[in-house]
Amino acid sequence: MAKIRIFELARSLNMTNPDLLDRLKEMGIEAKSHLSSLEDDIVEKVRQGVFRTEVEKPEKVEQKRVRSNVIRKRRQPVKSEAEPEAEAPAAQAPEAEEVTAPTAEEAVPEEAADADVSAKAETPTAPETPEEAEISVSEEAPVEEAADQVPPTDEAVDPAEAAPAEEESSPSRKKAKAKKHQAAKIIKFPDAPQRLSNKGVLEVVDDTAPADSPAAPAAATPAGEKDKKPSRKDRKKRGKTESVETEEAVPVKKKGVFKRKEIVEGVALYDRTRGRMRKKGKGGAKVPGGAKTQITTPKAIKRKVRINESISVAELAKRMGVKASEVIARLMGMGVMATLNQQVDFDSAALVAAEFEYEVEKASATEEELLELNVEEDQGNLKKRAPVVTIMGHVDHGKTSLLDVIRQSRITEGEAGGITQHIGAYKVNTANGEVVFLDTPGHEAFTAMRARGARATDIVILVVAADDGIMPQTIEAINHSRAAGVPIVVAVNKIDKEGADPDRVKREASDHGLVPEDWGGDTMFVNVSAKQKLGISDLLDMVLLQAEMLELKANPDKKARGVVIEAKLDPGRGPVATVLIHEGTLSVGETVVCGIHYGKIRAMFDDKGAPLDQAGPATPVELIGLGGVATSGDDLFAVGDEKSAKTVSENRQQKQRTEDLARKDSISLENFFEKMQEKEEKVLNIIIKADVNGSCEAIADSLQKFSSGEVKIHVVHSAPGTIIESDVTLASASNAIVLGFNVRPSPKVRALAAEENVDIRSYDIIYDLIDDIKKALTGMMSSTFEEEVLGRAEVRELFVIPKKGTIAGSYVLDGKIERGRPARLLRDGVIAYNGVIGSLRRHKDDAKEVASGYECGIGIENYNDIKPGDVIECYFLREIKPEL
């Protein structure tokens, strides 16, 4: 069922929101605010209730003059039919009352309203007396009243004050008073307060009925008075029955301007503008009670806040026009502890804004719309692309050597220690087509790199040495491939080596779910030798066969998308990213978004270093032009304009800042004791600088594994690039050591490090780096001690020797008693004293130790309270060095 909001219904009924809410309350309909929704049946009920015309019985109106230009009339209860009518027909008045028009200074404008108001003079249909003129009232159309309009307040009028007002029957006296104090009438409520002219005939039409409904017939009353139904505003004010009757100017003899009395009901007689103007005039009458201050409520269209993905608490409060403390209080009520400058997400901002009757909408398109993530692909535009193959396996099993043979290059010779410590992307032309290869590290420290390689690939070549079999990193590579849903081709390498056993590899692989095809499984096994260049063509044929089964296709005519394989900071070229294009075509000069960074591509190079203008699907490229060093594994998107790229980048940066602030440790009453205990821990602060971003990530992850309950590694800073002076300054301030991987500091940086007493360590092989940090952490840890009991002796007799104290004549029960060892005195199985054996004698000779079955004299240092029957237990503490 369709619904309509209250502010929309009020607009269609030409009413203000507060009036309609009051009307709904009178009708028994609950509504919290003008943003609430109503069902269709309730809306129809409200429309009928608003437009229904009620005809009441005429009531006698008693007029009282309060001021010279205001007459109050009080409705009297209708008399019963039994009472005789006391009033006789009034004689016809000779003519209407005459007053002169007020001066411009005395004219008082009314405040703005949305409906036009006009008055129409009616010809008297009944005889008039000189004291009372016939008053005609037309139905009042509903209008939106100004927010700060104040309803007239009732005044208690004494009979003594009312009597003189009724006795004023002389037209001359009325003329004099009207000339002095009469104010001009309003013919229209403008949108803004303005001064109205007092010239001409001003007429007022009552606006309590809809404009399209016919006016109710006026019933003639005694003395020419006409009955008037109480307005909705009067009913709201506790059923007040007083109405205000103002005097209009009657014909002025000089200018021929005719004015008459008319009832003005439901309109405020005082507002801010009118009050200010009356203070200027000397004869202006004061309104009793003054003006009531009301808070201006913005229109519904203005009660909206447009934000991006997040907004600060201070900015949200500013846009809603409320105090920031109130917004923080509402957030605390929702369980969100936020400060003035802290960012809140879109959902939290929407909930808080709803508390203040505001709506929240997104100011810009979403990231999915800007990056066109949900655009459906036309299958007719897809074309065949080259497969992406990742080579994975245990360290030193021959992965890079195998790739060397395929590429006919010598990569291994350039690797430090003969092991791969980066992820590389290469495109190879074979006899059967192009193949893109990704070479991943095999060391355990590069787990994240292998995971990224598995996610970015179509096929995995799992290299296993025939003489080693399945190793820990081999199992990890299998798990990464399964998690990515990528098919595996097993390459059994080093088959030419002595002790090679390909069948052993098949058996161990079968235990992990890789069953060979010749054993009834679905996994391809190929025997190869990178050193002897055996089986390479068979391996490529298997890879291309697997690729044909996958039917790999991509659309080269759309905006490019890719993934960052590796990123680094080049001193001469700036941020450099190795990207594998998945789909679309990337061109030089295009604007791209990559993680939290964006930029315009200035140059592209292939895996051999040749410049490129365009790169199609399944093409590894090295691009320059990003605003910062991208994170390995980030997705790259080509966008149409720089503005969209900047919007996406700023939103992502804001999210990252919010997450970083949330991760920062803060002290509270709940975690105070825990933080105090952490301060007692030994912390090794480290700054990591490497040649590429992936190496920084791998080193940081490996070192974090060494943290224990006693020692902890804190990575203060980690970034790609060479070691610079700011790194040394940061290390000096944070008491950290600087670890460089494949980078070297300049002589100037070394001099600064020596001056600041900062330790800089440079490594080329990750083995050495991890071992050194492990030794450093071990040295920081405290040793533990284990108690070992040497022997026990029973006290049988006591000897007191001057200057020596009490000597216990004892019998060694088991083990041995050694001089200088710690000992404890046991009495009835309870420890009576802990000390050290100070003296040990056997047959008047000092002894170093006494074995079991022998008698001896034992003296305990600084203790003489020994009794026969006590047991002396000798022991020592064995030191156990910590290990990580």
From Swiss-Prot:
- Region Disordered, as annotated, extends over 58-248
Query: Which parts of the sequence are annotated with region: G1?
Result: 393-400
- Which GO MF term does the entry hold, naming one? translation initiation factor activity
Q: Where does GTP bind?
A: 393-400, 439-443, 493-496
Stretches for region G4: 493-496
User: GO terms for CC?
Assistant: cytosol
The residue ranges flagged as biased composition, category Low complexity, are 87-106, 207-223
InterPro entries the record matches = EF-G-like_DII (IPR053905), IF2_II (IPR044145), IF2_N (IPR006847), P-loop_NTPase (IPR027417), Small_GTP-bd (IPR005225), T_Tr_GTP-bd_dom (IPR000795), TF_IF2_bacterial-like (IPR000178), TIF_IF2 (IPR015760)
Segments for region (G5): 529-531
Residue span(s) of domain tr-type G: 384-553
Where is the stretch described as G3? Answer: 439-442
Biased region (Basic residues) positions are: 66-77, 172-183, 229-239
Residue span of region G2: 418-422
Source organism's superkingdom?
Answer: Bacteria
Where is it localised? Cytoplasm
The task this protein performs is described as: One of the essential components for the initiation of protein synthesis. Protects formylmethionyl-tRNA from spontaneous hydrolysis and promotes its binding to the 30S ribosomal subunits. Also involved in the hydrolysis of GTP during the formation of the 70S ribosomal complex.
What is the protein's given name?
Translation initiation factor IF-2
Taxonomically, what lineage is the organism? Bacteria, Pseudomonadati, Thermodesulfobacteriota, Desulfobacteria, Desulfobacterales
